[in-house]
Amino acid sequence: GNKHSLVNDQVHDVMEDSDGDLWFATSNGSSLYQTDTKEWHSFFSSFDPIPDDKNHIFLTLCEVSPGVIWAGGFTSDICRIEKKKGFNISYLSPTTIAGVRPDQYIYDIKKDSNGDIWSGGYYHLKRINFENKSVRLYPGVTSITTIQEKDTRQMWIGTRMGLYQLDKESGIYQYVDLPIESPYICALYQRDDGILYIGTRGAGLLVYDINKKKFIHQYRTENCALISDNIYTILPRQDGSLLMGTENGITIYSPKAHSFRNWTREQGLMSINFNAGSATTYSKNALVFGGNDGAVRFPTDIEIPEPHYSRLLLRDFMIAYHPVYPGDDGSPLEKDIDETDRLKLTYGQNSFSLDVASINYDYPSNILYSWKIDGFHKEWSRPSQDNRIIVRNLPPGNYTLQIRAISNEEKYKTYETRNIQIIITPP
């Protein structure tokens, strides 16, 4: 809580204002970083002179007019900071104006193209006219997580139970039918050509065609190289790709190639667990993500390093679940299994196993293994991180065991294939 840093390391939202300064909503107040002077200021924290009964946990920030910042969090009041008036602080209570019960919290505040301010929380969605401070309530949807303008007439409203399209005038909500039951919406990004990217908690990245009103794709850890099914933030980059924050690191998604490139703690990324909605572009050439360890700044054109790979290693050869070593009595191994390219086994040794591994590798979770025995299996095994090969009751004959190391990020890229000739003698 000093004047030289963030007031608190748990960053729930981050925003660049019209002066190019950065604001942070944290678990103990809000922080401002002034880009020119490199000075920090904090507001509403336990270190600041504010009434004890006031909330310190902030979840969202919005610049409602130049130099006027609204902050929302675990209270139904909105806190207002006026930068140009010596950081004058005041409180606004939209629920009181609207004559409804106080909200448990305010999760998102957004300004639309008409200049109206939208505030979404546990109970209510409200539209606040900034000029006359009148409030319109939009009943019908609760547990709001994220608000995004669709166009001048409509809004996207993300909730813990799914996504809605709201008509601003009629107040009618339309539920967007997504291919998963009650998705928890964390992040929304709408492209100019009518493609909506939906980041969820637990269901990966969903892609929706607004014009055709149909869902195009669902990316999950099980069908692509995504490192997490929790997509907390989505930021566009100049080249058309998207930079996304998860609880396992960041991932760059290329819509053209339908590919993902990941940067994780394994590869030296510092803060790992990013928070939902906590990201912004900053000074045109940087992206700032907030997480459980403060905030991390990346250049917009960051290139995630190409994964480095070295060779495939074979080890831990066993027959009938007993370890076997070269030179042992009755052992089929003349040298270590990693140096063996031909294995002659008796009929009684036709159930065996071995492990595969990749050495000197900076990103182990990107390696998947697949194998098959030519002459016995028709198909390769499904690529997975399971590195144990188990063969049971292989009939007498001549075979080739083939083992592949495959990239999880680029499913069609085989790093290496190893072969062992296997002979099972008749009884």
Specify the residue positions occupied by each region the protein language model found.
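Residue-level "micro-hotspots" composed of small/polar
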Residues: G1-H12, D48-F58, A98-P102, G140-S143, ...
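Residue-level detector of Asp-centered blade-edge/turn motifs that repeat once per structural unit
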Residues: E16-D19, E63-P66, K111-N114, Q148-R153, ...
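Conserved beta-propeller blade signature
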Residues: D21-F24, V68-A71, D116-S119, Q154-I157, ...
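Loop/turn residues immediately N-terminal
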Residues: N28-S31, F74-I78, Y122-K126, R160-Y164, ...
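Short loop/turn segments that connect beta-strands within beta-propeller blades
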Residues: Q34-K38, E82-G86, N129-K133, D167-G171, ...
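Solenoidal tandem-repeat scaffolds enriched in leucines and small polar residues
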Residues: Y105-D108, G121
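Beta-propeller domains
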Residues: Y123, T145, M161-Y164, P183-Y189, ...
